[in-house]
């Protein structure tokens, strides 16, 4: 089992799919990485040599923000919005949808479980 960016990559899957187990790498970026390293898309992780795994690791470390660094960056961006006091920051602070979704009904994922209100029985 290869270990890239602190994540154990499954050995029986194709490299394109296996790279997507790393937070911050989707299908497009996985394809770009394999293109840079010149590894065929249909090759399995178990067929990779140690040198190829090392090349993939170097490309990811050099060019992409993944795993903990990406999570930290996103957290810092959200904290910055909240400190600014802009509309998006206020929505984050209040735990409401940020991107303009309706809140009269729905939005339960963001708001949490429904709170019981006295006198609202059927």
From Swiss-Prot:
GO terms for biological process: translation. It comes from the Bacteria. Residues 99-122 are annotated as: Disordered. The keyword Protease does not apply. GO terms for molecular function: rRNA binding; structural constituent of ribosome; tRNA binding. GO terms for cellular component: cytosol; small ribosomal subunit. Keywords: Ribonucleoprotein, Ribosomal protein, RNA-binding, rRNA-binding, tRNA-binding. The keyword rRNA-binding applies. InterPro entries: Rbsml_uS13_C, Ribosomal_uS13, Ribosomal_uS13-like_H2TH, Ribosomal_uS13_bac-type, Ribosomal_uS13_CS. Belongs to the universal ribosomal protein uS13 family. PANTHER family: 30S RIBOSOMAL PROTEIN S13/40S RIBOSOMAL PROTEIN S18 (PTHR10871), SMALL RIBOSOMAL SUBUNIT PROTEIN US13M (PTHR10871:SF1). Located at the top of the head of the 30S subunit, it contacts several helices of the 16S rRNA. In the 70S ribosome it contacts the 23S rRNA (bridge B1a) and protein L5 of the 50S subunit (bridge B1b), connecting the 2 subunits; these bridges are implicated in subunit movement. Contacts the tRNAs in the A and P-sites. Part of the 30S ribosomal subunit. Forms a loose heterodimer with protein S19. Forms two bridges to the 50S subunit in the 70S ribosome. This is Small ribosomal subunit protein uS13. It comes from Bradyrhizobium diazoefficiens (strain JCM 10833 / BCRC 13528 / IAM 13628 / NBRC 14792 / USDA 110). The lineage of its organism: Bacteria, Pseudomonadati, Pseudomonadota, Alphaproteobacteria, Hyphomicrobiales.
């Amino acid at each position: 089992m290869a270990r890239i960016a602190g994540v154990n990559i499954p050995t029986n899957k194709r490299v394109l799919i296996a790279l997507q187990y790393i937070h911050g790498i989707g299908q497009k970026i996985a394809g770009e990485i394999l293109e840079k390293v010149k590894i065929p898309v249909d090759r399995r992780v178990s067929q990779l040599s140690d040198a190829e795994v090392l090349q993939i690791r170097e490309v990811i470390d050099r060019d992409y923000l993944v795993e903990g660094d990406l999570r930290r960056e996103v957290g810092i961006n959200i904290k910055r919005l909240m400190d600014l006091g802009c509309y998006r920051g206020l929505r984050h602070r209040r735990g409401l949808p940020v991107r303009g979704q309706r809140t009269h009904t729905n939005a339960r994922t963001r708001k949490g479980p429904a709170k019981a209100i006295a006198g609202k029985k059927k």
